[in-house]
Amino acid sequence: TGVVDVSTTEAVDPYTGTSRYVPAQPAPLATLPQTRFLSFTHVQLASAHAKMLELSQSVPGATLSDDDQTAVATLVAALEQGTGVMPVDILGKLLRTWPLAARFPLLDLLRAAALHACTQPLTTLVSDALVGADWDGLDQASDVPSAPANAMLALRTLANGFVAPQGPATMASLALEALATLHQPPWHVLNRAGHTALATVALNYSILAVTQPTFEHAALLLDILTDVRFYPLTRQILRH
């Protein structure tokens, strides 16, 4: 009888010694631990700009001076180019003076600007986002139609901050304040997109926790990650 050569590393048929079919083996999982920050980069700048101008004409209190309009147009042009420093000062002003119902296009421009170097530090952009969304008042905002969009866009701004220039270091310095603010979020206001944005912020902070041995707020982060993981199931049970 013939002798089967077993010295080869190739898979062989034990009866004939010829190569045999071997199903493709699953590739090793390369998704965990996640080490790349996630962000929300898609934005329709022209639509956000047009909506802001429309609201300035239709919502009482959402006023734009000629200088304001010029500043916004300059910002939109810079965002379209995607290079240089974004002149965001106008957004901080309007997010503190416009009615809540008209702020969502401003927040959309802010979260787009948060991906870049800006005329204001990232810490200010984070503050502008949370103030602009009236985050502390969202628990009483279930009947405010714009609240879900405002909350979602504020969270997207925080998520985008991780990929901004010096973003990881800045978001690390804000970790205690940010995580304490996001702890026990206003779930009744967050829609699916808002839930995804919150999960992305939590994921980005978990990357910091994994990659930075000095991260000191793991317990607070774990509470948020647990809520993000289980709250949708809890909400579904409560509905039934």
Can you describe what each PLM-predicted range is?
Residues A193-H240:
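Structured C-terminal portions of repeat-based eukaryotic scaffold domains
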Residues T1-R20:
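Extended, low-complexity intrinsically disordered regions enriched in proline/Ser/Thr/acidic residues
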Residues Q25-A175, H195, Y205-S206:
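Alpha-helical solenoid scaffolds in large eukaryotic transport, assembly, and signaling factors
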Residues T1, L95, L106, I237-H240:
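Generic low-polarity alpha-helical segments
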Residues W98-P99, D143-A147, W187-N191, R229-R235:
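Short inter-helical turns and helix N-cap capping residues of alpha-solenoid HEAT/ARM repeat scaffolds
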